[in-house]
């Protein structure tokens, strides 16, 4: 598949982390990722033209073979803005909740979130995770209790039926809440891979006024994110790259933060009134939205140079 050429006067590809100079002699600030990396990861491949959101029109460069090609010039600029925002949050000792439950992003979300000690959800979004924090906190406490009983060998002393039941409960809680087990309060922002897939997370974050950073493909609504990163959310390499860059921003901010920045404020936890008034019943919101099929033809290979 032919790769659209990019105007050299707009951008001169260079290695990540190095300053660049355009043809006019202007110094371009250091990039958080190179254009070559974006191309090789297939970040520019969007969805088929018949499956798109018109609001993404401004981020589309062209169309090739029935597939939209995303404008990587904009992707690069917006990714740098998202990187800077994530860095600023980390500098203040804040936290970013990573969310990516689709198969293509599960690995990257877990690996990168753990690397920078951030909470994450990569199995399924439990309804009310943000809006019903009080109830979720009780479940997290239960998770820690079951982990302790297992580590101390207490579960082995129970009758077989009861032991199996508690181990099953532990497995389920670990899958759903393991990534947020150490989250003591609501995050300062949410980073989402695929807005269309993670509608529950989007709705809860927006209800609470939490900033949303998102990798947004051509079939999504960019208005649902505060920091839009236009790009392919169906290719593993694309997800890996974007998630890593956001994590790099957090890591850079953590290196500048002081220990005092990580001390939770007295009012860090949401007020009970807000938790009750805005809460979304956990049991009633268990069901996930149906995942967007990924069966469509979508180029993900490395473009020929």
Outline where the language-model segments fall:
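N-terminal cationic and glycine-rich segments that engage phosphates or anionic surfaces
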Residues: 19-95, 101-102, 106-150, 160-165, ...
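Long, charge-patterned amphipathic alpha-helical coiled-coil/hairpin "stalk" segments used as oligomerization
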Residues: 116, 121-227
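Short glycine/threonine-rich loop/turn motifs
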Residues: 200-260, 264
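Residue-level signature of catalytic and energy-coupling elements of molecular machines
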Residues: 42, 98, 190, 242
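Intrinsically disordered, compositionally biased charged tails
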Residues: 1-30, 255-305
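Small/polar loops that bind or transfer phosphate-bearing groups
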Residues: 100-101, 193-194, 231, 238
């Amino acid at each position: 598949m032919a790769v659209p050429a990019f105007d050299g006067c707009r951008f001169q590809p260079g290695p990540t982390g190095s300053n660049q100079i355009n043809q006019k002699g202007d110094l371009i600030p250091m990039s958080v990722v190179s254009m070559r990396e974006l191309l090789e990861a297939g970040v520019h491949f969007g969805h088929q033209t018949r499956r798109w959101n018109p609001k993404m029109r401004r981020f589309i460069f062209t169309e090739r073979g029935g597939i939209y090609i995303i404008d990587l010039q904009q992707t690069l600029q917006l990714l740098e803005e998202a990187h800077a925002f994530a860095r600023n949050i980390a500098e203040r000792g804040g936290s970013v909740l990573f969310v990516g439950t689709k198969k293509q992003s599960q690995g990257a979300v877990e690996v990168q979130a753990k690397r920078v000690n951030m909470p994450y959800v990569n199995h399924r979004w439990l309804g009310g995770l943000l809006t019903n924090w009080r109830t979720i906190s009780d479940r997290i406490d239960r998770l820690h209790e079951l982990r302790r009983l297992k580590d101390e060998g207490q579960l082995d002393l129970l009758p077989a039926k009861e032991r199996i039941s508690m181990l099953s409960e532990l497995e389920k809680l670990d899958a759903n809440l393991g990534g947020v087990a150490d989250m003591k309060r609501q995050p300062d922002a949410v980073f989402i891979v695929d807005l269309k897939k993670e509608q529950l997370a989007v709705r809860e974050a927006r209800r609470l006024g939490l900033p949303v950073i998102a990798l947004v493909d051509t079939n999504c609504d960019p208005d649902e994110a505060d920091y839009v990163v236009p790009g392919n959310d169906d290719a593993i390499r694309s997800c890996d790259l974007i998630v890593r860059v956001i994590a790099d921003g957090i890591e850079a901010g953590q290196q500048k933060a002081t220990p005092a920045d990580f001390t939770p404020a007295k009012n860090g936890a949401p007020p009970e009134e807000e938790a009750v008034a805005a809460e979304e019943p956990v049991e009633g919101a268990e069901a996930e939205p149906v995942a967007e099929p990924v069966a469509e033809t979508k180029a993900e290979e490395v473009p020929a140079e």
